[in-house]
Amino acid sequence: MAERLDKPLAWLHGEIKTPPFSKEARIEAGVLLRRIQQGESLALPYSRPMASIGKRCHELGVTDKEHEWRIVYRVDVDAIVIGDVFEKKTKKTPRK
């Protein structure tokens, strides 16, 4: 049986911007990203498609003590591309 390899995480801008997540939020983000890397297709309440941004683009929600964080990512054939990480401050996600 062939071993399935996890898709690597690739940062769109070549850098890792670490928001001030609590330890619990870092663990939650890590677990959810690992599941995506392993090929799992997450749905609400964890992730939702962002067709307005592009094909295969999604928004991953991470709840912290006093903040709602979003990780915008795209599922490519060979990698999971992280486009942005930001604090959610409004009901609507900005298109940028």
Q: Language-model features: where?
A:
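Basic, Lys/Arg-enriched alpha-helical interface segments
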Residues: 1-68, 77-80, 87-96
